[in-house]
A protein has these predicted regions:
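Conserved donor-binding/catalytic core segment of Leloir-type glycosyltransferases
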Residues: 5-6, 188-205, 211-214
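Membrane-proximal helix-turn-helix segments that form the acceptor-binding/catalytic region
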Residues: 127-148
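Conserved donor-binding loops in enzymes that form glycosidic bonds
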Residues: 9-10, 93, 175, 197-203
């Protein structure tokens, strides 16, 4: 039976976990789950159990980068050889070494474009080195993909230029949001308010921009 495999062994928290949940939920309820065998490679299946989805748990992937590299470039190849894989979708940036008729990768992390300064080395030395490393992690096998998936138009252009990828192969999957009624939008309260923005503490999230926008 033709198989769709979603690799997401590194997604355990924050927005990326929400994306994984939304994707698996939509896939489990779609007609595709009746046509294809769907297998999800995850860290822990307890929080993301949906019908019509099979799970393979790989908890070591999050513990050390060596495990992650082993899975992406060696172990996943063994898994792909066990099934007739129509689509292999990697939801966490790296393009694994696999056998599949169609391959796609969701590139959600903009770290390669982080313009770090000397002060950043003192504030978050680990992240600065991570940002420099991630550019090369993205590069491996990237041209083996049929499609790249990003969230924003500027990322489509930036990744296309950085890795010399035809931008027609890069899909912009914008986050879903409900339309705001124009009457509500124009009704601005003069009362004090509390602005609550839940997010993981990551330097590349540009919290300053969000705070400046609230002033407006």
């Amino acid at each position: 039976m033709n198989t769709i495999i979603i690799s997401a062994v590194n997604l355990t928290e924050g927005g990326t976990l929400s994306i994984l949940k939304s994707f698996l939920q939509a896939l489990s309820m779609s007609e595709l789950s009746n046509i294809y065998r769907v297998i999800a490679l995850v860290n822990n299946k307890d929080k993301i159990l949906y019908p019509n989805i099979e799970y393979i748990e790989l908890p070591k992937a999050k513990k050390r980068w060596l495990y992650r590299i082993y899975y992406e470039y060696f172990y996943f190849k063994k898994i792909s050889n066990q099934f007739d894989v129509y689509l292999w979708l990697s939801l966490h940036d790296m393009s694994p070494n696999v056998k599949a008729r169609r391959r796609a990768v969701y590139m959600h992390n903009p770290s390669p474009f982080f313009r770090w300064k000397v002060k950043d080395v003192f504030l978050s030395k680990k992240y600065v080195f991570f940002a420099m490393f991630y550019k090369w992690a993205y590069r491996i096998n990237i041209h083996q993909n049929d499609y790249l998936i990003v969230q924003q138009e500027w990322l489509r252009k930036a990744f296309g230029e950085m890795f010399k990828v035809d931008q027609k192969k890069i899909i912009v999957a914008r986050p879903y949001h409900e339309e705001i009624d124009s009457k509500e939008r124009n009704s601005v309260s003069t009362l004090p308010f509390t602005f609550f923005f839940p997010a993981l503490a990551r330097p590349f999230k540009n919290f300053e921009v969000i705070c400046e926008a609230v002033i407006i």
